Amino acid sequence: VDGRIKPVRDGGRVTASFILRPYRVADEDAAIALWQRTWQEAYPSIDFAARVAWWRVRWREELVPNAAIIVAEQDGVLAGFVTIDPSGYLDQLVVDSRHWGSELASTLVDAAKQRAPDGITLLVNKDNGRAIRFYLRCGFKQAGEDVNPTSGRPVLKMIWTP
């Protein structure tokens, strides 16, 4: 995460270039809006607009002080981010849906792996087959089932070890 431009491929061709950099406080509104929009697209039956106030508190009080947040920016616009805490827990991987299917998400996961050389754990909604397949392609393994303590939804625990 050095501010270098990272080309992202889609089907073998370079489609866009992104700058990966550390999160800045000025990114808060864009990051929260991106979180809401992408989760709403992934789970249209859930009212994520109603959760924005809760998410802003969680973002400010839990993630920003305790995790490395790496953002991907294209032409000055936030296109994605990943959070990784010192224990190697990946809480959020958020990518603008316009870049779903590109290599942007795996580029962000690779940045998280650099921050967590001993390994990464994460929870993924059990009904999110697309995300599960993505994490498997990134080298993660399933390591059990659980229930998300916040949403009550069934989740899979996944781990990556170097």
Model-derived features with residue positions:
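Conserved N-terminal entry element of GNAT/NAT acetyltransferase domains
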Residues: 1-26, 160
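Conserved GNAT-fold acetyl-CoA-binding loop/helix
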Residues: 28, 32-59
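Conserved beta-strand in the GNAT
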Residues: 71, 77-94
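A short, internal acetyl-CoA/4′-phosphopantetheine-binding micro-motif in the GNAT/acyltransferase core
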Residues: 90-100, 124-125
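Conserved acetyl-CoA-binding loop-helix of GNAT-fold acetyltransferases
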Residues: 95, 101-114, 133-137
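Conserved active-site alpha-helix within GNAT-family acetyltransferase domains
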Residues: 106, 127-144, 150-153
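Conserved GNAT acetyl-CoA-binding A-motif
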Residues: 115-127
